[in-house]
Amino acid sequence: MIVPLQGAQMLQMLEKSLKKYLPESLKVYGTIYHVNHGNPFNLKALVDKWPDFNTVVVRPQEQEMKDDLDFYTNTYQIYSKDPENCQEFLGSSEVINWKQHLQIQSSQSHLNKAIQNLASIHSLQVKHSENILYVVSETVRKLFPSLLDTKNLSPGSGKPKAINQEMFKLSSLDVTHAALVNKFWLFGGNERSQRFIERCIKNFPSSCVLGPEGTPASWTLMDQTGEMRMGGTVPQYRAQGLVSFVIYSQDQIMKKRGFPVYSHTDKSNTVMQKMSYSLQHLPMPCAWNQWICVPM
């Protein structure tokens, strides 16, 4: 059975229900939070049954997914209470269009078996990335306090070192900055990723510091799942604490708006891991997962 959740009441019930399964449901919880606050990416939620669902998929409306090669748009967020038995639901073409280049995101590594099986059935090549999922300590305290182990918090205030404010000015990104963000984004560097970045800048809060030239020296922004992503610093201004300052500023903006604040970091990126620790971002017991699926 496929049940589309329509109307504010059902979607608010889903958000409340997903809260019980944090942090494993975080990727879907963050997305539904944004669907319930304006839904600028025109997403929809599908469940296998209601109200006692096992699996939920959040995805764009069909009319948004016109480009079969655009996995930045063709993105699905998945949470399942029963990852071993969700394959049939995920295999439905009404739930996931397996004919396109697509991307699946989830805080559940256990979905890998079902996704790999379905990709094999539909002749898709899969690249699975598993990264460290970080959540800001205040979000942990508010949403799932049982995981707040103060032993894991860095000593100190969690604030970054001051920057040279005569040289650098705190600001937000403009759509004209998308090309710069795209150039330094590990998952980007192409026309489709630039369109995605432009859409994020237009619709969600972002933070940057402008260098003496008046262009961004360091930045971070938010995507449609409510995650802080695409942080970067131009090479000549690295190792000056700018990205810590920018991420902390973005933290504050998101907290004021009531958003859950989270991000991910590659397991090999020790510099960002140290920075996350200093800002009191806590690593979660579950991972940040991405599956990029491309037809063979």
From Swiss-Prot:
Keyword ATP-binding attached: no
E.C. number(s) listed in UniProt: 2.3.1.13, 2.3.1.71
Keywords annotated in UniProt: Acetylation, Acyltransferase, Detoxification, Mitochondrion, Transferase
Gene3D superfamilies: 3.40.630.30
GO biological process: benzoyl-CoA metabolic process; glycine metabolic process; monocarboxylic acid metabolic process; response to toxic substance
Annotated Pfam families: Gly_acyl_tr_C (PF08444), Gly_acyl_tr_N (PF06021)
N6-succinyllysine PTM positions: 16, 127, 142, 169, 183, 256, 267
Database matches in SUPFAM superfamilies: Acyl-CoA N-acyltransferases (Nat)
Gene Ontology cellular-component terms listed: mitochondrion
Superkingdom in the source lineage: Eukaryota
Reactions catalysed: an acyl-CoA + glycine = an N-acylglycine + CoA + H(+); benzoyl-CoA + glycine = N-benzoylglycine + CoA + H(+)
Chain positions found as N6-acetyllysine: 16, 113, 127, 142, 159, 183, 256
Major subcellular site: mitochondrion
Compartments reported by the entry: Mitochondrion
Listed GO MF terms: glycine N-acyltransferase activity; glycine N-benzoyltransferase activity
Disulfide bonds: none
Keyword Mitochondrion: yes
InterPro entries to which the protein is assigned, alphabetical: Acyl_CoA_acyltransferase, Glycine_N-acyltransferase, Glycine_N-acyltransferase_C, Glycine_N-acyltransferase_N
Family: Belongs to the glycine N-acyltransferase family.
PANTHER family referenced in this protein's UniProt entry, alphabetically: GLYCINE N-ACYLTRANSFERASE (PTHR15298:SF9), L-COA N-ACYLTRANSFERASE-RELATED (PTHR15298)
Function (record text): Mitochondrial acyltransferase which transfers an acyl group to the N-terminus of glycine and glutamine, although much less efficiently. Can conjugate a multitude of substrates to form a variety of N-acylglycines, thereby detoxify xenobiotics, such as benzoic acid or salicylic acid, and endogenous organic acids, such as isovaleric acid.
The protein's name: Glycine N-acyltransferase
Organism field: Rattus norvegicus
Organism classification: Eukaryota, Metazoa, Chordata, Craniata, Vertebrata
Gene name in the database record: Glyat
